[in-house]
Amino acid sequence: MKIFLLRHASPDRNHTDIPYDIPPGPPLSSKGKKEAAALAVFLKTQGVVKLYYSPFERTVKTAQIVSASNDIPCVEEIKLAEWRGEHETEIHVKARMKSTFDNAFRECAEIGPIGLVSHGGPIDVLLQELGINKDELAIYKTKFDTTNPLPPAGAWEVERNENNHSWNLNLKFIPPTT
């Protein structure tokens, strides 16, 4: 049973008039569309059968590109939304992300691997909740953009250990640079 924690592909940062952390947020850049297409190829090799995505434009489009390429359903899930900064505590982000993860994990036992398309901050909080310590995450953050534990259109694979009490967490996909 696998869950993939997926960060949206690269947004178009030229839209400075569009707030980044308030829906809809900026659309994908042309680079982001290519990253999402590469993510689709990877997820097909992993047998992902369903996606849930945040309601932000960049996550919606990432999910739509993957869904169309792989002919799998995708469903909006508000709990995967971007961290709302000062309006939302880390405890709240952790609770909503863990709730969504737990529901998806139960579902993947019945249907197969599922992808959750979200944002770097919420994925960071969830990875810590699942057992990665902050020092290890800091190493990943230095590889990307100092605040995110995975690149745009990157994927963490989450599997239950044999003892059923902990998780195997692996950064499985980094899109090729273009």
Where are these regions (language model features)?
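Active-site-proximal alpha-helix that buttresses catalytic centers in soluble enzyme cores
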Residues: 2-76, 83-88, 92-94, 152-153
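Short active-site segment of divalent metal-dependent hydrolases/proteases
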Residues: 11, 122-123
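Acidic, low-complexity terminal tails and accessory targeting/binding regions
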Residues: 42, 86-91, 110, 128-178
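Active-site signature of alpha/beta-hydrolase-fold catalytic machinery across serine-
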Residues: 65, 125-129
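Short hydrophobic/aromatic-enriched beta-strand-loop microsegments
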Residues: 70-78, 135-142
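Internal catalytic-core helix/loop-beta-alpha segment
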Residues: 87-111
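Beta-strand elements within well-structured catalytic alpha/beta cores of enzymes
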Residues: 2-6, 52, 112-122
